[in-house]
Amino acid sequence: MASPAPLVASISHQMVALQTLQLLQQEWGWGDGPVAPGNPRDPDHVSTAPARRSGPPRARPGPGREERGGGVGTRSRRTAARANSPEEEVVRGAEGGAELLPFPRDRGPCTLAQMAMRSALARVVDSTSELVSVEQTLLGPLQQERSFPIHLKDSVEFRNICSHLALQIEGQQFDRDLNAAHQCLKTIVKKLIQSLANFPSDAHMVACASLRQILQNLPDI
């Protein structure tokens, strides 16, 4: 039985990249945060809810310190004020990923360039999610039966590109990083198709068809 270790490691790097991009979408108000692989979100959906923040639990009032005048509402308003403060606008990325920079939200309607950037980012996120799903459900069992080449360095590069992308704010460098992530993801998919091409079994053909569908969703930008 062939070892699935290279594929597992490759998926791990892709998952970190995916979570980093999903958190980037969430921080910019372009998505709902991390979702399970294989469940792409609507790229046109824009979340207006603030990102959830974690913090230490508040102590309950002790005897003689009972809050008055609608204490729950008061606490909620104070919590909302903290969540919307500028100091809370930096969000940690996925474990091992990058720290996301704050994105200025109150900028009015999106320009055409911003809409195109949002669409391109959503396409990379959804395609990465689909790729991880195909690798886990189809390629994993095939790799255990018969080994085929896995190019781990491409997934490592993809993760690094996405981590660098998360450090950028709009501009030419962001566009270059997004295009690099797009092209690197296409390279990963193409090499997987090539690795499976020499195995004519039905299961390999199904996996190749799924990978080709991902390629169709990644046109050149």
Curated annotation (Swiss-Prot):
In which tissues has expression of this protein been reported? Ubiquitous.
Region (Disordered) residue spans: 31-92
* InterPro entries, sorted: DLEU7
Q: Which domain of life is it from?
A: Eukaryota
Q: What is this protein called?
A: Leukemia-associated protein 7
